[in-house]
Regions:
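Short secondary-structure transition/capping segments
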Residues: 17-18, 70-73, 108, 152-154, ...
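Context-gated lysine
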Residues: 46, 53, 82, 109, ...
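Active-site core of metal-dependent hydrolases
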Residues: 1-107, 113-114
Length: 192
């Protein structure tokens, strides 16, 4: 069975329709992966409740973290993850994704459109680093949000863990959590 990746917006209904489907049908929470759960505080609080019931949730990482927190009122990923973990959410049910190569409109504080940016997948490692350095989330938990957790939740066989018979996809980091080498299917594709 597939997974439905639900992109959440600013609607005051938040996750109500997902919860209605789960409550009123035979479709389990494991079939849904709501993303952008850190879009605003109200949605984020609903996401905590949803995750405490066993649902998986996905934070959207951003390259310009301060902009999205201060101008757009998003819940900063590291702060949101810390709050979820402190609330008792299973860390294996949390992922971070990017809007890599997606369009990102840029607004000022008055909500006026200033231009268009492009989402970067490089934000994932930046968000993991913030989780570790700003909120003391253990590195293995922070890393799992972009490795083993999405692979498990999305049923990606051979991905997400270093195990025999899995694809040999690795990112080697230095002490400052900077990427120094990338190995894809056992072959080095990037090295500083």
């Amino acid at each position: 069975a597939g997974i439905i990746n639900v992109h959440l917006g600013d609607s005051p209904r938040c996750m109500d329709l997902i919860e209605q489907v789960i409550d009123e049908t035979e479709i389990p929470a494991s079939q849904f992966l709501p993303t952008h759960v850190n879009r605003n505080e109200m949605l984020f609080r609903k996401a905590i409740t949803y995750a405490l019931k066993g649902g998986a949730v996905d934070f959207t990482g951003n390259e310009d973290i301060d902009y999205w927190e201060t101008i757009c009122d998003e819940v900063r990923v590291c702060n949101g993850m810390k709050r979820m973990l402190d609330a008792g959410v299973n860390p294996n049910r949390i992922t971070i994704s990017s809007d890599g190569q997606g369009s990102l409109p840029i607004y000022n504080k008055q909500g006026e459109f200033l231009g268009m940016g492009v989402g970067q997948s490089s934000c994932l490692l930046k968000e993991v680093k913030e989780c570790v350095e700003r909120t003391d989330i253990p590195l293995e938990i922070a890393l799992s949000t972009i490795t083993s957790n999405p692979a498990e939740i999305l049923n990606l066989k051979g991905k997400g863990k270093i195990e025999e018979e899995n694809d040999a996809d690795l990112c080697i980091l230095d002490q400052e959590l900077q990427m120094i080498e990338v190995i894809a299917k056992g072959k080095t594709v990037y090295r500083i």
